[in-house]
């Protein structure tokens, strides 16, 4: 039987000949066939925008191609990356859970170790995840992954599941969200079926629970999870848990669960640095067979710094815009479309002036002077731009802060820096760095 991956590669080859290159690259190329059974092909796409367009414009074509390739009538089901994760493998149970049959998974096909970009901020979490995938129930049990939204926790958890299922296709690998665990528990209580609930979860060879922070305040759920954890741990089965914060920082979490989570390894994932963000974009482009100029990668990576989802979302928008508009992939073309978010923290004008002067290795008096030297003039323009971004001061007040400059000078400076950051990556990176320093200074407690 042809695997989903091979079947989808054949389908992509056919679709590429029937669609224009911009349409194929934008709407079809990055999709993944994640399961095929009972005449239903489940295809995962990047986001809801792509999903809606595919349903309206290419649904019949997808069904036709897959029907021709398989020799059976195929119905297409489209889902996005945001699909609620469900149990993967499990024996039949009278408990009415939405389990997936053996050898079929609800995993994101892209969330594998080979597609995970390792950097300084996630290296330990990656190494620990790979270690438990290779040798579960030993050194790091449980493994507790913690970090902010969109930093790769779910990617690593699903990569572990992929790895185990590839090595042992019949293994009972359960990957569920805390909400799913809770809902299954509620169903079992309502139907007086706790025995099946406990049997199901405690029979796992490998249990991965996502978003455990949502267990707070749910006393009975915590009670059941505690006993499930103990049962699996005592049997030498691996448990992996993910949360947006460390166990000790989850409010309302029972002390005994904090103790259990802390007995293994707590691996923190931080926001990726610039080099890692660039590597993430480069790898995504390579997998999607898209050529990205280095300056575009640098621009996106320097402007989207909070998490990987935003980073990849910006890349998708850039690709969609250039493909649909039939324009070249350049910083000048994508900058107005992306309109990257800038997190601003209010700061005192004097603080901004000091930070800018230090960066350009100038004395504050030089920065506020009327000097027309190029380096002084540029630093002053940058300072005015940042003061407009990080304060509520009017243009005349900003001019006063910079030694009594005219408001038209401030307006010209802000416009010039706005245009320059869209054309020059170094300027863009400088502004990002200075804004970050200003944010930190603005958040510092007053002494």
Curated annotation (Swiss-Prot):
Record localization: Cytoplasm
Any one cellular-component term (Gene Ontology): plasma membrane
Region of interest called Domain II, as start-end residue ranges on this chain: 79-105
Span list, region Domain III, AAA+ region: 106-322
Transmembrane feature ranges: none
CDD domains given in the database record: AAA, Bac_DnaA_C
Region of interest (Domain IV, binds dsDNA), residue spans: 323-447
Keywords: ATP-binding, Cytoplasm, DNA replication, DNA-binding, Lipid-binding, Nucleotide-binding
One family name in Pfam for this protein: DnaA_N
Biological processes per GO annotation: DNA replication; DNA replication initiation; regulation of DNA replication
Family statement: Belongs to the DnaA family.
Domain notes: Domain I is involved in oligomerization and binding regulators, domain II is flexibile and of varying length in different bacteria, domain III forms the AAA+ region, while domain IV binds dsDNA.
Function: Plays an essential role in the initiation and regulation of chromosomal replication. ATP-DnaA binds to the origin of replication (oriC) to initiate formation of the DNA replication initiation complex once per cell cycle. Binds the DnaA box (a 9 base pair repeat at the origin) and separates the double-stranded (ds)DNA. Forms a right-handed helical filament on oriC DNA; dsDNA binds to the exterior of the filament while single-stranded (ss)DNA is stabiized in the filament's interior. Isolated domain IV (residues 348-447) binds both E.coli and B.subtilis oriC.
Name of the featured protein: Chromosomal replication initiator protein DnaA
Organism: Synechocystis sp. (strain ATCC 27184 / PCC 6803 / Kazusa)
């Amino acid at each position: 039987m042809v695997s989903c991956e091979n079947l989808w590669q054949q389908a992509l080859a056919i679709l590429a000949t029937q669609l224009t290159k911009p349409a194929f690259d934008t709407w079809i190329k990055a999709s993944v066939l994640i399961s095929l059974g009972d005449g239903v092909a489940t295809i995962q796409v990047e986001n809801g925008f792509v999903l809606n367009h595919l349903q309206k414009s290419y649904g019949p074509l997808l069904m036709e191609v897959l029907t021709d390739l398989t020799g059976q009538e195929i119905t297409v089901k489209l889902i996005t990356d945001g699909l609620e994760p469900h149990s993967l493998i499990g024996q039949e149970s009278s408990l009415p859970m939405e389990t997936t049959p053996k050898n079929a998974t609800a995993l994101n096909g892209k969330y594998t170790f080979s597609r995970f970009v390792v950097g300084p901020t996630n290296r330990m979490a990656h190494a620990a995840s790979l270690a438990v995938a290779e040798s579960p129930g030993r050194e790091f049990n449980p493994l507790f992954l913690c970090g902010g939204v969109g930093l790769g926790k779910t990617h690593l958890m699903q990569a572990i599941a992929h790895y185990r299922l590839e090595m042992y296709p019949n293994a009972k690998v359960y990957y569920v969200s805390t909400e799913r665990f809770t809902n299954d528990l509620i169903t079992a209580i309502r139907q007086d079926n706790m025995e099946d609930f406990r049997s199901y979860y405690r029979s796992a060879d490998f249990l991965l629970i996502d978003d455990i922070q949502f267990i707070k305040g749910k006393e009975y759920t915590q009670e059941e999870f505690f006993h499930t954890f103990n049962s699996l741990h005592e049997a030498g089965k691996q448990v992996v848990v993910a949360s947006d914060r460390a166990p000790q920082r989850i409010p309302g979490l029972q002390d005994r669960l904090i103790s259990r989570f802390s007995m293994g390894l707590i691996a923190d994932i931080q926001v990726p640095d610039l080099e890692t963000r660039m590597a993430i974009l480069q790898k995504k482009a390579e997998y999607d067979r898209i050529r990205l100029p280095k300056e575009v990668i640098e621009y996106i990576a320097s402007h989207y710094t909070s998490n990987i989802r935003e980073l990849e979302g910006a890349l998708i928008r850039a690709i969609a815009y250039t493909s649909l508009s039939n324009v070249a992939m350049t910083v000048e073309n994508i900058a107005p479309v992306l309109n990257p978010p800038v997190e601003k923290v209010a700061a005192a004008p004097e603080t901004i002036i000091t930070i800018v002067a230090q960066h350009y290795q100038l004395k504050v008096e030089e920065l506020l002077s009327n000097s027309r030297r190029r380096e002084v003039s540029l630093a002053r323009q940058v300072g005015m731009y940042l003061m407009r971004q990080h304060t509520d001061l009017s243009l005349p007040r900003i001019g006063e802060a910079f030694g009594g400059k005219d408001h038209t000078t401030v307006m010209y400076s802000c416009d010039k820096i706005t245009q320059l950051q869209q054309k020059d990556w170094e300027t863009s990176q400088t502004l990002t760095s200075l804004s970050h320093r200003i944010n930190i200074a603005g958040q510092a407690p007053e002494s």
